[in-house]
A protein has these predicted regions:
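Structured C-terminal cap/extension of enzyme domains
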Residues: 251-275
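N-terminal intrinsically disordered, low-complexity tails
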Residues: 7-39
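Conserved small-domain helix->loop->beta segment predominantly found in fold-type I
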Residues: 202-256
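Long, highly charged amphipathic alpha-helices
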Residues: 4, 8, 197-203, 267-270
Length: 275
């Protein structure tokens, strides 16, 4: 019975292509998935089989494009906490694109437009999901397996001088950084995994939305979700792996399902066994 229901939900995921303008005036393909809207970026995703030799300078340039930044620098991991502390002391707020329980999409564009100095940490969700600097964030902090031991700090075009100076004080030249031999494959695999987890979360959210024991579901990709409009204009490539839900027998108590890149049917069946 459960297997049949899982198959029904999964098989109902039909992709219908279309296009829409993103928040920066670019185009995205919009896929309607049985009430769940999936945003697919037009940036070509690097795959595990598409591994090429790159320099650290090229890696940095890739993040400038992804985040919509004006420039980017490599900062040793050992200096990151000190850099963030300096920025916070100067009035910056460090946020993530997806945060809170129940999960919601941070309004980077709205908060930046209101004058808030934002540093967006995209190390968890992946820079490919959030064009943070294009949306107005002063900085975006990313991680990449090709440059282990460093973070990529992306700076908005016309970055506030003191913020740029704080970054430059901790940064090193990309020309002095050697790309890890296996880093390209690891990074490509991580991106594929994140996208697969996001796709799985779409199905899990749709499944939980019609579950007889579930009182409420929060997932940015559901049309009924409070963050849906913001998610479709500020995220690209998917809505992340987090699905929060509330059992009818435990009102007010949120639980989190974190999707993975494994087969979604198996994830749902395991969820039911544990639940």
């Amino acid at each position: 019975m459960l297997s049949a229901l899982v198959n029904k939900v999964s098989d109902k995921v039909q992709v219908m292509g279309g296009t829409a303008q993103d928040g920066a005036g670019g185009t995205k393909s919009v896929c309607a998935i049985d009430g769940v809207t999936q945003i697919a970026t037009d940036v070509v995703t690097q795959t595990v089989t598409d591994v090429v030799t790159q320099t650290a300078t090229e890696v940095v340039a890739e993040y400038v494009k992804m985040t919509g930044a004006g420039r980017a620098r490599l900062v040793p991991v050992s200096y990151v906490d000190e850099l963030l502390a300096t920025l916070i002391a100067g009035g910056a707020s460090v946020v993530e694109p997806l945060a809170g329980v129940p999960v919601e999409v941070c309004d980077i564009k709205g908060r930046a437009a209101a004058g808030e100095l934002l540093v967006v940490d995209v190390r968890t969700i992946g820079a490919e999901f959030s064009p943070a600097c294009r949306l107005g964030a002063e900085l975006a902090v990313a991680a990449d397996a090709r440059v282990p031991g460093y973070v990529v700090v992306c700076m908005r075009k016309c970055c506030i001088p003191w913020v740029a100076e704080a970054v430059e004080a901790k940064a090193c030249s990309a020309e002095d950084v050697t790309v890890a031999a296996t880093g390209a494959e690891e990074q490509a695999s991580a991106r594929v995994s994140r996208h697969a987890a996001s796709d799985a979360a779409q199905v899990v959210a749709a499944y939980l939305a019609c579950h007889p024991r579930v009182e409420a579901v929060r997932y940015p990709g559901l049309k009924a979700d409070p963050s849906f409009a913001r998610a479709t204009s500020q995220l690209v490539g998917g809505f992340g792996p987090y699905v929060d839900y509330m059992w009818k027998e435990s009102p007010g108590e949120w639980h989190r399902f974190t999707a993975t890149d494994e087969d979604v049917r198996a994830q749902i069946i395991n969820f039911e066994r544990l639940g």
